């Protein structure tokens, strides 16, 4: 399996809300926001985490005009067996960091899916099917509390991992050095804290 960092397709557990096929567990995820929010990093980390956990994975980032000032997004597919197509039309899970991303991808989310949104920048009730579970995470505020607003992407990813339960936070933390460029390794501790903070938030959210 080719695991080069710049490869646009990186291919490499009961899980709440995930679909089970004849070939086992299979989930399609879209992560979206605007350029500068670390959308691609979150997608790469999710893909690397799943790969390190022995899953099959594809990762497809969206580059080009959309990334600058508009909606940046990436598609991640995680499965127990070979993935036929890396393109995600209707995601099982959607992580959105801003309103534009919610408006663009919200209508595509499958019934019974999971929506995690950054309520720091999304102050509206999403117009999605009633079967979809919506979790609003004040990611920017939580990241600021940790001392680095740029870790909001890790907060929402931690929330997703905790909610779905198919991958462990510790596995994601261990995958960070492989995902973040070495010159930014001084940020590893705060990024790990952000992953855990997002997970803690969802744990509390589920209990209220």
Where is each model-derived feature located?
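Active-site cofactor/cluster-binding pocket
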Residues: 2-208
